[in-house]
From Swiss-Prot:
Listed name of the protein: 3-phosphoshikimate 1-carboxyvinyltransferase
Classification lineage: Bacteria, Pseudomonadati, Pseudomonadota
Annotated source species: Pseudomonas sp. (strain PG2982)
Gene name for this UniProt entry: aroA
GO terms of biological process kind: amino acid biosynthetic process; aromatic amino acid family biosynthetic process; chorismate biosynthetic process; response to herbicide
Active-site residues, as the UniProt record annotates them: 326 (proton acceptor)
Family: Belongs to the EPSP synthase family.
Length: 449
């Protein structure tokens, strides 16, 4: 599904205290995997709390195209899966729209099948490099026909029987790790992924939950060895998807920045590989209270009470990047209102997201009067605690949902309004954002440029 052709600019203005309780839409990583693993498992999978953004729905459609039966009854998604090893060759190309996660994970899932599968996406996704996922698949015997630079549109031609490999992930990427593990599901023998820096581990936890023969060992240097034995049986599960920490970041930072705010966010995923932003904000002096911490479906979940806070600049350790890679844009907004300097380093992954996210953030900050320096892999922001002189600019979002939401948050606390050139694509990850934020008291509206 492509975004509407005509852009919908939006403007955020300085707001009074934000107050209330909200429940964030389901986690995107877990939602993608729920559709995939449910579609692959034998028997019935029932999902509540699924993120119904376009990206996740595209993953569901891809699984339907390969034989899974998916329907919705009330609030519950019900999937009847095909059984591991029994995916069918899709009749047409699988269209992932803007969904990098869905596309890359599905490439792993189907690559080792003896069939031909084509992948297409929107203009933004078609610019993103897929080689990091395709290279290990090539080692397993998959043939690839791709556009220049291993980009989409592309076609995978699977081997008669795939070779199990041992693959050391060359960069901190949960998508690459996951793609290789999923390829291992349909491969005889043991497929091993060696991960020098731990990244989000939903694939491992959820595959174990669905019954895969998967083990994780961490050596004395913190290097993880993940082994999966292929061609085993997966069994349908019941899943309640917790709230997405990456989406939580926007109302959370807004509540910290808008004077007098007091907001409670319910049912947030607190998986330790995803909480880098909360940790960083707490180091900056944020008043974030973790309430009712609990385990749900093997994942850590809690409620967060967030109150307006005076923030101070910090140096964010580069090794924290994998646990908050999607949150740097909104952290840069928080840093714009913090006293002193905030240094963010190790941001090379941001160059290959929906946009060159690092450059997009730096340009947006500059357009709104923020003193910042963009390095090769770093961003330094010198803040203005009172928001004086900030705002007044229009931000080029480059079809990137996180850039759009981050700068709308900025406008809520800046002296002058902030406009983003398009808000259509917010629907890819957080369709409720434009209604939920005004419900707390945020002044955000669609604007006429």
């Amino acid at each position: 599904m492509s975004h509407s052709a005509s852009p919908k600019p939006a403007t955020a203005r300085r707001s009074e205290a934000l107050t209330g309780e909200i429940r964030i839409p389901g986690d995107k990583s877990i939602s993608h995997r729920s559709f995939m693993f449910g579609g692959l498992a034998s028997g019935e999978t029932r999902i509540t709390g699924l993120l119904e953004g376009e990206d996740v729905i595209n993953t569901g459609r891809a699984m339907q195209a390969m034989g899974a039966k998916i329907r919705k009854e009330g609030d519950v998604w019900i999937i009847n899966g095909v059984g591991n090893g029994c995916l069918l060759q899709p009749e047409a190309a699988l269209d992932f729209g803007n969904a990098g996660t869905g596309a890359r994970l599905t490439m792993g899932l189907v690559g080792t099948y003896d069939m031909k599968t084509s992948f297409i996406g929107d203009a933004s996704l078609s610019k993103r490099p897929m080689g990091r996922v395709l290279n290990p698949l090539r080692e397993m015997g998959v043939q690839v026909e791709a556009a220049d630079g291993d980009r989409m549109p592309l076609t995978l031609i699977g081997p008669k029987t795939a070779n199990p490999i041992t693959y050391r992930v060359p960069m901190a990427s949960a998508q690459v790790k996951s793609a290789v593990l999923l390829a291992g599901l349909n491969t005889p023998g043991v497929t091993t992924v060696i991960e020098p820096v731990m990244t989000r581990d939903h694939t491992e936890k959820m595959l174990q939950g669905f019954g895969a023969d998967l083990t994780v060992e961490t050596d004395k240097d913190g290097v993880r060895h993940i082994r999966i034995t292929g061609q085993g049986k997966l069994v349908g599960q019941t899943i309640d998807v917790p709230g997405d920490p990456s989406s939580t970041a926007f109302p959370l930072v807004a509540a910290l920045l808008v004077e007098g705010s007091d907001v409670t966010i319910r049912n947030v995923l607190m998986n330790p590989t995803r909480t880098g932003l909360i940790l960083t904000l707490q180091e900056m002096g944020a008043d974030i209270e973790v309430l009712n911490a609990r385990l749900a479906g093997g994942e850590d979940v809690a409620d967060l009470r967030v109150r307006a806070s005076k923030l101070k600049g910090v140096v964010v350790p580069p090794e924290r990047a994998p646990s908050m890679i999607d949150e740097y844009p909104v952290l840069a907004i928080a840093a714009s209102f913090a006293e002193g300097e905030t240094v963010m380093d190790g941001l090379d992954e941001l160059r290959v997201k929906e946009s060159d996210r690092l450059a997009a953030v730096a340009r947006g900050l500059e357009a709104n009067g923020v003193d910042c320096t963009e390095g090769e892999m770093s961003l330094t922001v010198r803040g203005r605690p009172d928001g004086k002189g900030l705002g007044g600019g229009t931000v080029a979002t480059h079809l990137d949902h996180r850039i759009a939401m981050s700068f709308l948050v900025m406008g809520l606390a800046a002296e002058k309004p902030v406009t983003v050139d398009d808000s259509n694509m917010i629907a890819t990850s957080f369709p409720e954002f434009m209604d939920m934020m005004p419900g707390l008291g945020a002044k955000i509206e669609l604007s006429i440029l």
